[in-house]
């Protein structure tokens, strides 16, 4: 794309949550690559955080954007969830849903799908309330800082989750590797990183705005996770991709990795 990499200032000024949600999270029952991508992530997260999966006390979601779908499974297995995003608008959108404010985005179809995966299709309202009770805070984050949640300081977490965010925040492979190390600093030794990364994606559209990404190969993501001090427990590469007009990626990579114990 022209004009250089879209950094934090551009996101703060031009990233409109409702345009983003309308493009990627409509989930109205009609088939689309975007709906299939959402289902892929919900299914992976259900398997990761469902019965017999990861559990603990604290989970930090980095780069939440204006979305809550990514913690629907985790709210059953963690007691304290932190959501975070760089932009004011995205954090405001999250707070609006958490506080049931008028005009909040309607996640009902997505919550119902998550409940179906859990075998509780009729309990979507209870699921929403469980999630609202489990999310304890919404913080600003910047993955390029040594403490991505600064100035907030949280105890080391049992799990860090980041979906479809890191590749959009980093302008190069080196920046991505450094950001992963920053995320690792938020975890306890033995804690888990759970991430989905779009592969070979150089930019994506939000409304009429184009936002840049670092185009990553699966092998680069895998090596970056290892270099950040993790052992990879699961790596799933899928050809799942978005509509070419929205985000011309070439598959995705879902990873569960465990932070190595300290010396």
UniProtKB/Swiss-Prot annotation:
It catalyses: a tertiary amine + S-adenosyl-L-methionine = a methylated tertiary amine + S-adenosyl-L-homocysteine + H(+); a secondary amine + S-adenosyl-L-methionine = a methylated secondary amine + S-adenosyl-L-homocysteine + H(+); a primary amine + S-adenosyl-L-methionine = a methylated primary amine + S-adenosyl-L-homocysteine + H(+); dimethyl sulfide + S-adenosyl-L-methionine = trimethylsulfonium + S-adenosyl-L-homocysteine. Its EC number is 2.1.1.49, 2.1.1.96. It is found in: Cytoplasm. S-adenosyl-L-methionine binds at residues 20, 25, 63-64, 69, 85, 90, 142-143, 163. GO terms for cellular component: cytosol. GO terms for molecular function: amine N-methyltransferase activity; N-methyltransferase activity; thioether S-methyltransferase activity. The modification N6-succinyllysine is found at residues 13, 96. Keywords: Cytoplasm, Detoxification, Methyltransferase, S-adenosyl-L-methionine, Transferase. The keyword Iron-sulfur does not apply. Its main location: cytoplasm. Belongs to the class I-like SAM-binding methyltransferase superfamily. NNMT/PNMT/TEMT family. Catalyzes the N-methylation of tryptamine and structurally related compounds. Functions as a thioether S-methyltransferase and is active with a variety of thioethers and the corresponding selenium and tellurium compounds, including 3-methylthiopropionaldehyde, dimethyl selenide, dimethyl telluride, 2-methylthioethylamine, 2-methylthioethanol, methyl-n-propyl sulfide and diethyl sulfide. Plays an important role in the detoxification of selenium compounds. Monomer. This is Indolethylamine N-methyltransferase. It comes from Pongo abelii. The lineage of its organism: Eukaryota, Metazoa, Chordata, Craniata, Vertebrata. The gene is INMT.
């Amino acid at each position: 794309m022209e004009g250089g990499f879209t950094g934090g200032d551009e996101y703060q000024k031009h990233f409109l949550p409702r345009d983003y949600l309308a493009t990627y999270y409509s989930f109205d029952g009609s088939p689309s690559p975007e709906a299939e991508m959402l289902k892929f992530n919900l299914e992976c997260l259900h398997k990761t955080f469902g019965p017999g999966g990861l559990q603990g006390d604290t989970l930090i979601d980095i780069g939440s954007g204006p979305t809550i779908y990514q913690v629907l499974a985790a709210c059953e297995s963690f007691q304290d969830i932190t959501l975070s995003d760089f932009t004011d608008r995205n954090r405001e959108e999250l707070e609006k849903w958490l506080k049931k404010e008028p005009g909040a985005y309607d996640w009902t179809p997505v919550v119902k799908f998550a409940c179906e995966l859990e075998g509780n299709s009729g309990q979507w309202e209870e699921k929403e309330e469980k999630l609202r009770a489990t999310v304890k805070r919404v913080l600003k984050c910047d993955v390029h800082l040594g403490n991505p949640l600064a100035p907030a300081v949280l105890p080391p977490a049992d799990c860090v989750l980041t979906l479809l965010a890191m590749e959009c925040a980093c302008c190069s492979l080196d920046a991505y590797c450094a950001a992963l190390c920053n995320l690792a600093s938020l975890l306890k030794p033995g804690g888990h990183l759970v991430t989905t990364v779009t592969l070979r994606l150089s930019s994506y559209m939000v409304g009429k705005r184009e936002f840049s990404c670092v185009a990553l190969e699966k092998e680069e993501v895998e090596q970056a996770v290892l270099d950040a001090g993790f052992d990879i427990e699961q790596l799933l590469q899928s050809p799942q991709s978005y509509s070419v007009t929205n985000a011309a990626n070439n598959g995705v990579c879902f990873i569960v990795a465990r932070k190595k114990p300290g010396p």
